[in-house]
Every structure is written in structure tokens, then in C-alpha cells.
Amino acid sequence: MNQTAPTARMPRQIPFIIGNEACERFSFYGIRNILVQFLVSSVILAYIPEAQREGAAKDVFHSFVIGVYFFPLLGGWLADRFFGKYNTVLWFSLIYCAGHACLALFEDNRNGFYTGLFLIALGSGGIKPLVVSFCGDQFTTANKHLAKIVFDAFYWVINFG
């Protein structure tokens, strides 16, 4: 009798995890590349003399980036202590989407726009420390040989952004 080993399959969650990360990175890099130019030319900083707008826009940009890289501490702590990786990634992804809604709705309202940037930084920070390990958690000993393929794709997506 010829028995073959069962073929291990790719976990069905993987495309969704990679897709979520691709959207998050695309969004972050898109905002990062145009935020200063947008702020200089928009009504958000119209109260500042034109000669000082670029400096003020860079201050906003750097505050946003600091938030993006500070909030992973909060996201990791919440996942480890209270909610787990899945729930934390899910809810912080929704916070991220709410931030984009604020940017779209409040393009000419300073408080609404800054709230959107804050929510995006919070959402990005909540996702950042968890998504790689959450991706790895989807594999068992039966399909761990597929993990290299997935992580190659995962890091390609992150860097392609």
C-alpha cells in the first residue's frame, strides 16, 4: 500500500493578513510623501504667515511620524495584556480607517484633520508590532515549510508599500 503524506496547505488567513499590511504600508507611505506639501498649500496652516508654513508643516509631519513609531509600545502592551493579537490588529485597523475618514471629511478643519492624523498614527502603531508574529502564528509543524514563502511575500509587500 502506497501512502503519501498529506499535503500541507497555506493557512487561509494569510492573504488577508498580507493584504491588511499592504494597505497599511501603502497608506502610510502615501501620507508620508505628501503631508508637508499638503499642509503648506492647504487652509489647515493658513493662520501662519506663508514664510513659516513649511517649518510648521514639518513640525506636524515629525509629530505624526513620532506617533507612528511610539504607539507600537501601546499596541504590543494591549495585545499581550488584554486583547490578543487578532483583536488588537482588528480594532487598530478600524481606528486607522477612522483616521482616514477624518482626513477625507476634515480637509479644511484643523482639529478634525489633526484628529485624523492622530488616529492614523495610533492605528499604525497598534498594528506594527503584532502583524509579523500574528502571521507566524498561523503556521503549524505540518505547514511550517510554507512560512518562508509567506514571509518573503510579506516583506516584499512591506517594502513595496
Language model segments and positions:
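Cytosolic juxtamembrane N-terminal segment immediately preceding the first transmembrane helix
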Residues: M1-Y29, I34
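Small-residue-rich segments within alpha-helical transmembrane domains of MFS-like 12-TM solute carriers
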Residues: R25, Y29, A121-L130
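Short amphipathic helix-loop junctions that connect adjacent transmembrane helices
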Residues: N33-K58
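Central cavity-lining transmembrane alpha-helices of secondary-active solute carriers
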Residues: K58-D80, K128, F160
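Glycine-rich segments within core transmembrane alpha-helices of 12-TM secondary carriers
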Residues: G67-F71, S124, H145-G161
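C-terminal ends and interior cores of transmembrane alpha-helices
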Residues: V89-T115, L122
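Intracellular juxtamembrane helix-capping segments at the cytosolic ends
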Residues: G126-A142
